[in-house]
Amino acid sequence: MRVLFLFCSILFLSLRSSAQKPIEYNISFPNAKHHEAEIELLVPDVPAGALNFRMSRSSPGRYATHEFGKNVYGVKAFNGQGKPLELNQIEGDVYQVENHDGTVKISYTIFGNWVDGTYLSIDDSHAHINMPATFMWIPQLQNRPITIRFNNLDIYGWKVATQLKPGSSPDTFTAPDLYYFMDSPVELSAHHLISWTDRNTDKTEQIIRLSAHNSDNKDIVSNFSKKVARMVQESKMVFGELPRFDYGSYTFLHDLGAGNAGDGMEHRNSTVITDNLIAIAGNEPDLLGTFSHEFFHSWNVERIRPKSLEPFDFSHANMSSELWFAEGFTQYYGNLILRRAGFLSDKEYLGVISGILNGVLNSPGAASFSAREMSRRAVFVDAGVSVDRNNYANTFTSYYTYGAFIALGLDLR
């Protein structure tokens, strides 16, 4: 009887946990031309006591600190009856409410005008969303499921491209927990979408998608997708198979524009690739380098992952001694895959190898510091922002180059 009671108690708690109500996000764009979005989150079943909510200071795939809270304003909180709650800002990006009734609704305005893999950008043409740069979250409730609705899509003629799981309507998506939500970038725009099916070595089929927001017509995007598909096949040859992507698909979120930053950012089942070019046409070789690097990350970093990056902490920079492997080996294989796929000539590939060798052998930083030490410097150099001068010319060698140098040496051996 005691064993049966214990079993029933565990089952009850398990079912209760699995039936937790999701945290609901809504994002709207009534003032997109001025780079603003309005965000609401509804938090049901709030535990008794004070509730903290905050913006992130770190983002998956980035290793330095980023002050995402600086672009948040007009923060308000309400209880389940719609009555305002007293709001305390206890840190620059952390807020607290008390005396709630078990439900808390939070609303705020956010500004974003920078297209890359880390930040948020909004205008009449699109909303380019990195989740940690956009959405507040509840530290106490990181395991709750999440739903999100993207409003105003019809007004702007936008579609949704993301690795999030589709929900009950075209503008609604879900995530099983906070980490997957934060690791799922979103492109809202009138983009071209090209999809194809990949048959894995175990005969299972998965969908690979290319979302392209740029000035090219669909034929150009379609032709480019064939090159991307060739790269994907060559990448598969390195490991013998592709990863088993969650929800059966992988998405390249590609965004070109004259004001964009050049960037690539890996995620578990997608990647963001941005550049300040206005078109794919004529720039295919340069773009394929980023595509190859980022897709290789779907194994290396996303599934072959440094223990030092788990669990990922969104509240501060995440330091790792293994980025020479995570990023450096990816750098090496990204270029090797392009050579094997026929996108680089022997001369072009040898130029890449020469750059790797010179980047380490002639670097004062590499002469004084190990690859592990350079990896730990990422918390300062990986798109981190500072205004004072530094001595990086004499003390730093990129862990990308350092790791690629080691990978080359092992391959030659």
Where are these regions (language model features)?
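Bacterial Sec-dependent N-terminal signal peptides
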Residues: M1-I23
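Non-catalytic architectural context of zinc metalloproteases
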Residues: L42, E67-G74, F78-M231, V238-F245, ...
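Early extracytoplasmic/domain-onset interaction patches
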Residues: Q20-S58
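Acidic/His/Gly-enriched intrinsically disordered linker/tail segments
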Residues: R305-F312, A317-Y400
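Juxtacatalytic substrate-recognition/specificity segment
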Residues: T197-L323
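Short glycine/serine- and small hydrophobic-enriched flexible loop segments
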Residues: Y332-R339, F405-R413
